[in-house]
Every structure is written in structure tokens, then in C-alpha cells.
């Protein structure tokens, strides 16, 4: 993320923002190649507003692991630091090797999604307190489900002017099994309400977890493109614009293989993307973040599905 110069001591300890998840990858060829890169746990306290000093000021997070093989398929993993963050987790290698994953944001935001942002003032031991970034709202199409709203937030507490840090762009990140070839589909629509000239959503496929509010994600992504809402809604794929209608749900699919990704809108090819950053392990995350510089209504996100080879 954008560095907060006032959070550190100028030497080595600043703020840890990479301890809310723990991942596993496995190899079947003595470490030449790896598969999985799956979240085995997300910190149950990651969305707590008083995270930094919850139950004491000690170091904390879902990092530092040890493991024991239980049988042919199962591994017992001890992970985490702090009495309320340590866990024992049993992982099945067949789950690690799965090729598909699906989510509906209204049901799975707590269990599968990283959606918090930070109050950029250091608290406790190298920590920030948190606030919601993306939030659940009713589906405007009239169904009973909820969906995720990703927008530019109107909250001055998310700004540290002294360090020139601004975490008001809401975002969300979701993990799926890694693949150098794969297909991700997601349903979205423009939210009802006011939009600014630069309102929209940056969509990125990455090979690791980036914080939901990390506006630098696009600079390190394998593939990335924006969804623009003004002056008329469209996807911007290189120099090509693919329009879509507001007030309705749409589906985007990204089919990537090698150095290229084909982007389709509602089942029709909309354009192609060239790989911006290479990774030996392919993509394992999709990241969404607001592009607005002024408070807006943003974009709604419903379902995401992934399948890899």
C-alpha cells in the first residue's frame, strides 16, 4: 500500500497490514512448480474497529505457522500470534488442489472476502484500527439477497494528511486456486446515486493478496482494467471502450492464458488485455477498488466464479 511515513520508526518496524490471512501451496515435483496458493483462514477479528488493541497491545495476526502431517491427505497446521488469533487448522491436500471456487458477496463477505480499510494512525504493536471498506446493501433489482457496494467513501478519519495517505477508496479482494490459465466471471452493476467524473472500479487479477484499500494494486497486477461510469458507462480495455447500460446487472468474464486475457461482457468478446506483470504461479486473486476521487455511489458486486487449469 501507499507508505505511511509516520507509522514506522524509520528503521524496520512500521505497521503490519499483511497478517489477516494465511496461505498454503503444495508441490508435486520437489518444488519445481506449486499449486493452490489458497487462503486456509482469514482472521476472525480483521473487521473489528478496535483491532489494534483488542484484548491487549501485544503483537497479533494470522502468521507464523508450524505443521504436522496427519495422514496421506491431511495436515495439521498451528498458526497465528496472540491468544485470540492462534488457531489449529486441518487442511486436506485435495482441497488445496481444487480447480474451482464460487462466491455470492451477500452470503460470503465474512468468510471469504477481505473488505476492510484502515485508520492510518499506528496503534498498539504495529497495527491500525479498521473500518468497513466495501459494505453490504440490498439488491436494487428487488431480490431478497444483499450485494457488495464498492465506492469512494466520505470519511476524513481514513486520511493522514501529514503522511499524504488516503484510504477512502473502498475495495474488496477474493482468493481462488491459482492458475496460469483460467476463467473468472463476476456480476456487477452501477449503483443508483450520484457519480463523479472519475467514478468507477479498477479490476485486477493478482498472484497474491493486496489490501482492499490498496490503490497501487493495479501497478503489480497480472491483468488490470477499469470500469468507467462517466460520461457513459463502459469498460476501458486498452484503447477500446465496451459500453454497458446502467440500472441492470451485467457479467464480465476474464479468460487468461499465457500473456493474454480475453475480456467478455454479457457473453460477447469486448477486448483483450496484455499481461502487465509476469508470475510463475499465475493468478490467485481478483481485486476490486473504487477509482473515484470524490464521494460517489460506486458499483455493486454480486457473484464471482473461478475455474483454473
Show where each model-derived region lies.
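Asp-box/BNR beta-propeller blade signature and adjacent active/binding-site loops
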Residues: 1-115, 119-138, 154-156, 228-231, ...
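Extracellular beta-strand elements of beta-rich domains used
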Residues: 91, 107, 252-254, 302-306
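Secretory/extracellular carbohydrate-interaction modules
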Residues: 144, 150-232
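Beta-strand-rich interaction surfaces with strong enrichment in secreted/lumenal proteins
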Residues: 170-177, 238-244, 289-291
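Extended, low-complexity, turn-rich repeat/linker tracts enriched in Gly/Pro/Ser/Thr and Asp/Glu
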Residues: 190-196, 258-261, 294-295
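Localized edge beta-strand/strand-to-loop motifs within extracellular or lumenal beta-rich domains
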Residues: 248-262
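Short strand-turn-strand beta-turns centered on an Asx-Gly dipeptide
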Residues: 264-269
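Flexible glycan-contacting loops in extracellular carbohydrate-active proteins
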Residues: 273-306
Amino acid at each position: 500500500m501507499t507508505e505511511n511515513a509516520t507509522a514506522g520508526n524509520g528503521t524496520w518496524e512500521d505497521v503490519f497490514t499483511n497478517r489477516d490471512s494465511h496461505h498454503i501451496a503444495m508441490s508435486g515435483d520437489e518444488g519445481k512448480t506449486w499449486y493452490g496458493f489458497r487462503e486456509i483462514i482469514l482472521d476472525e477479528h480483521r473487521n473489528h474497529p478496535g483491532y489494534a488493541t483488542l484484548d491487549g497491545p501485544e503483537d497479533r495476526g494470522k502468521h507464523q505457522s508450524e505443521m504436522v502431517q496427519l495422514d496421506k491427505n491431511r495436515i495439521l497446521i498451528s498458526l497465528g500470534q496472540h491468544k485470540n488469533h492462534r488457531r489449529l487448522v486441518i487442511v486436506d491436500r485435495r482441497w488445496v488442489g481444487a480447480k474451482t471456487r464460487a462466491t455470492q458477496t451477500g452470503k460470503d463477505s465474512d468468510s471469504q472476502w477481505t473488505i476492510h480499510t484502515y485508520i492510518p494512525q499506528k496503534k498498539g504493536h504495529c497495527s491500525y484500527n479498521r473500518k468497513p471498506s466495501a459494505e453490504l446493501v440490498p439488491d436494487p433489482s428487488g431480490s431478497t439477497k444483499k450485494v457488495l457496494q464498492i465506492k469512494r467513501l466520505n470519511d476524513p478519519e481514513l486520511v493522514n494528511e501529514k503522511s499524504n495517505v488516503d484510504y477512502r477508496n473502498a475495495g474488496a479482494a477474493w482468493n481462488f486456486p491459482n492458475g496460469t490459465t483460467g476463467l473468472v466471471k463476476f456480476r456487477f452493476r452501477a449503483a443508483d446515486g450520484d457519480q463523479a467524473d472519475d467514478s468507477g472500479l479498477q479490476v485486477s487479477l493478482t498472484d497474491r493478496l493486496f489490501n482492499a484499500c490498496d490503490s497501487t494494486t493495479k501497478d503489480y497486477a497480472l491483468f488490470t482494467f477499469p470500469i468507467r461510469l462517466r460520461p457513459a458507462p463502459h469498460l476501458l480495455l486498452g484503447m477500446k471502450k465496451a459500453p454497458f447500460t446502467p440500472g441492470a446487472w451485467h457479467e464480465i468474464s476474464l479468460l487468461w492464458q499465457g500473456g493474454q486475457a480475453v475480456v467478455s461482457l454479457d457473453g460477447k468478446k469486448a477486448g483483450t488485455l496484455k499481461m502487465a506483470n509476469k508470475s510463475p504461479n499465475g493468478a490467485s486473486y481478483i481485486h476490486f477498488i473504487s477509482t473515484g476521487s470524490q464521494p460517489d455511489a460506486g458499483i455493486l458486486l454480486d457473484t464471482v466464479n473461478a475455474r483454473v487449469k
